[in-house]
Amino acid sequence: MSSMHALAPSAEYPITDRNRLKRRHDRGSYDRCSVHAILDAAMLCHVAYVIDGQPFCTPTLFWREGDMLYWHGSSASRMLRHLKAGTPACLTVSHLDGLVLARSAFNHSANYRSAMCFGTARIVDDPEEKAAAMRAVVDRFYPGRSDALRPLTGQEAKATTFIGMEIEQASAKVRAKGVADDEEDYALPIWAGVVPVRTVLGEVEPCPRLIDGVAPPPELGLYRAGRSLDEGLTEAQHAYEEG
Amino acid sequence: MSSMHALAPSAEYPITDRNRLKRRHDRGSYDRCSVHAILDAAMLCHVAYVIDGQPFCTPTLFWREGDMLYWHGSSASRMLRHLKAGTPACLTVSHLDGLVLARSAFNHSANYRSAMCFGTARIVDDPEEKAAAMRAVVDRFYPGRSDALRPLTGQEAKATTFIGMEIEQASAKVRAKGVADDEEDYALPIWAGVVPVRTVLGEVEPCPRLIDGVAPPPELGLYRAGRSLDEGLTEAQHAYEEG
């Protein structure tokens, strides 16, 4: 784990014009751990890409393996057809953690964690990498589950396209604090405070057509009712990485 | 409210190559009500824009007035400097509503609501429109609150830039149902079901420096503990529209 090890990735992503934070430097960082923690707490990301000068912002499920990001969709989708040759993309994850009501309009804010990742998105066409992605898209979220499923058919494999992108640059941005008013405003008789926001899991709704006696699988324990989705996804990522 | 009224906006956004759904047509629509409902339930969006061929995907707070979308940031921000001349943008909102575990990898899915809006983003430089935005950025989320705040200073107004974009095309996409397995897979002894996901508000954390006797304002009632953020934001939008 020493950063002196020749093969260890450096602690920070390289900083270029693409990912350099242009404002609120106090909220930002470039280190891998911060970026990965924000990514691993999410299932949904937004990917920006360009077709003929027109930007598109597409929401999609994604997952991370080291510095690789993967997402998937039908080979018919607009984005994927255009990505075949490899195209610059920006994948962003954001978590809204709180509403911040201040004593002035200017100091109203939100608590959040976000990560922006830059790279070149490419279709995964290597058969081994694609087979691994077919398992990962299930097992990253539900560790061990792919072994228990009905095996993939050849037709399903053909109809599935995965996109892979190595993170070339990235940045993380976090606001996680209370009201930050101008010093003289604290004396005003105006209410200020934070409303926390949390994304939580509800009671599982089993499929009404379950075969009698089929018990909930162990991976469902990660997503028990009342837990944060964040926590469940982060724990699932760790379990997935440990194999 | 009749669609025969000459001045009423048509029920659907025009369909062009930009917003035409390329897959899962069964989940999509182009009607204003569906798109607006998804937007109005959110505070956070992701905006895609392009600088020198490089796509950026930026998370930001936003709000809607009719078919106009607004978001804001420091005039120093990368996005805004490049948007001054007006630039194509795509603003997307997504809500994750559930994890869908099926009997095959292929039928794993998520419940979600998303809206993609296309248009030309421009700096709001008309003084009246900017003054209105200064109030709206507070009042859309906290109806009536801007009147109770310490007034904006000239320096704050100068340091604030708003972006406006009229929605030229848009689409909505929704998955809101249970497991959809292949018919023959329902006979398999594999667990399947849905884990609902909800974004909820926590107990308010008042600023520790509140002046004695300052009571929580009425607009905070929209964001009471245990309520969905969705619901609070949707109700706030209605209150804001009713003035």
Give, region by region, the residue ranges found by the protein language model:
Chain A
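N-terminal short leaders/motifs
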Residues: 1-22, 66-76, 112-121, 240-242
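An N-terminal domain-cap segment
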Residues: 13-70, 81
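A generic structural signal for short beta-strands and their flanking turns/coil linkers
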Residues: 43, 67, 85-89, 113-117, ...
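General beta-strand recognition
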Residues: 68-70, 90, 173
